[in-house]
Every structure is written in structure tokens, then in C-alpha cells.
């Protein structure tokens, strides 16, 4: 994608992103002397997001979903999450369901982005040959341009009541008939 190409051209390595139940992360390792350029490029991806590669990224996610169907560890983990967190969002697959991946709407993605990708929900972690006192002004200059918005209201879920012991079994893997 364009962001990866840009930061890799300045020496970044390990450019990646990932999502879990409660968070998304973006990671890259880059030379300390490129900090100003990295701050500008990274802040721009939130100031002026480009969803041009939406379809190709979606295809990557769908392919990841398909690969996960053959992964016994993932299948076991998903089974445990479904049973342990029944009725809670943690019971759902992080990557989504095929019906969500087959017919997504860009408008829904943008709506989600605008609701949740707000400064109050973001944390920037920098590690390496940098001094916080020297860099904090540049961080504020780059990311301080993000418009402050109230954090979205979060749904409150009831604590799961676990009473007694439950036992579930599942076959995972290849079992010939």
C-alpha cells in the first residue's frame, strides 16, 4: 500500500498493522534521523485518510479469513471464545464473518473510522534513540492537528455470570469418516 511504500522508502522495516477485540495497532521500525518525516507521513494517514485501496485490502482480509479456516489453533481459540463469552462481542471472530467480508460498504467503513479513530482513542509509542523532551513538540505539531472529538459512547456489557462448570467438546482438524 502507499503508506508502506512511503515509509519503507525512508528506511522503515517491519511495517504492519493488526486488530484485536479492543484495539488496532500500526507498527514500523525506522531510522531515528527520519523521525520528522515519519511523524508527518503517519499523522497524514489519520488527518486525510485515503480509502483508495479498500477493495484490495478487503481481498487480503478475506484471504486471511479463508486461511484461518484451516488453522487448528485459530479454530480452537474461536471455539473457546464463543463458549466462554457467549452473548458478548468477544464471542465473535475478530476478522468478521464471510457475509460481512463479501458485501462491505465503504460508507460503513468511513463511518466506523470517523467514530472510533479519534485522538482520545489513540496512543503513540516511540522507542529508540530519541529524547522525549526534544521530540514532544514535533509530535504535538504533527498529531495535534487532529480535530478533537468526544470519545464515542461505548456499550456496557453485563459481567458474565459463570455458574458451575460447563463442558463442551469439538472436533478440530481432519477426521476421516
Feature map (PLM): residue ranges:
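Divalent metal-coordination and catalytic microenvironments
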Residues: 26, 42, 61, 109, ...
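A common structural junction motif
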Residues: 44-51, 142-150
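M16/insulysin-pitrilysin zinc metalloprotease superfamily fold
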Residues: 29-58, 136
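Non-catalytic beta-strand/loop surface segments
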Residues: 2-32, 67-121, 145-177
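Short, conserved phosphate-binding/catalytic loop or strand-edge motifs used
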Residues: 21, 59-60
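Non-catalytic, conformational "gating/processing" segments within enzyme and secreted inhibitor domains
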Residues: 58, 106-142
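Solvent-exposed loop/turn segments at secondary-structure junctions
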Residues: 32-35, 129-132, 176
Amino acid at each position: 500500500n502507499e503508506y508502506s511504500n512511503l515509509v519503507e522508502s525512508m528506511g522503515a522495516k517491519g511495517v504492519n498493522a493488526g486488530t484485536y477485540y479492543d484495539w488496532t495497532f500500526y507498527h514500523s521500525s525506522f531510522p531515528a534521523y527520519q523521525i520528522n518525516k515519519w511523524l508527518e507521513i503517519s499523522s497524514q494517514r489519520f488527518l486525510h485518510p485515503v480509502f483508495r485501496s479498500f477493495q484490495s485490502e478487503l481481498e487480503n482480509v478475506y484471504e486471511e479469513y479463508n486461511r484461518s479456516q484451516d488453522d487448528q489453533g485459530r479454530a480452537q481459540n474461536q471455539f473457546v471464545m464463543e463458549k466462554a463469552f457467549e452473548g458478548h462481542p468477544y464471542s465473535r471472530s475478530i476478522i468478521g464473518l464471510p457475509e460481512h467480508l463479501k458485501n462491505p460498504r465503504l460508507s460503513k467503513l468511513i463511518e466506523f473510522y470517523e467514530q472510533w479513530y479519534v485522538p482520545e482513542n489513540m496512543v503513540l509509542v516511540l522507542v529508540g534513540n530519541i529524547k522525549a523532551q526534544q521530540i514532544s513538540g514535533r509530535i504535538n505539531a504533527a498529531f495535534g492537528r487532529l480535530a478533537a472529538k468526544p470519545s464515542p459512547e461505548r456499550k456496557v456489557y453485563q459481567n458474565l455470570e459463570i455458574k458451575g462448570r460447563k463442558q463442551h467438546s469439538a472436533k478440530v482438524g481432519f477426521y476421516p469418516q
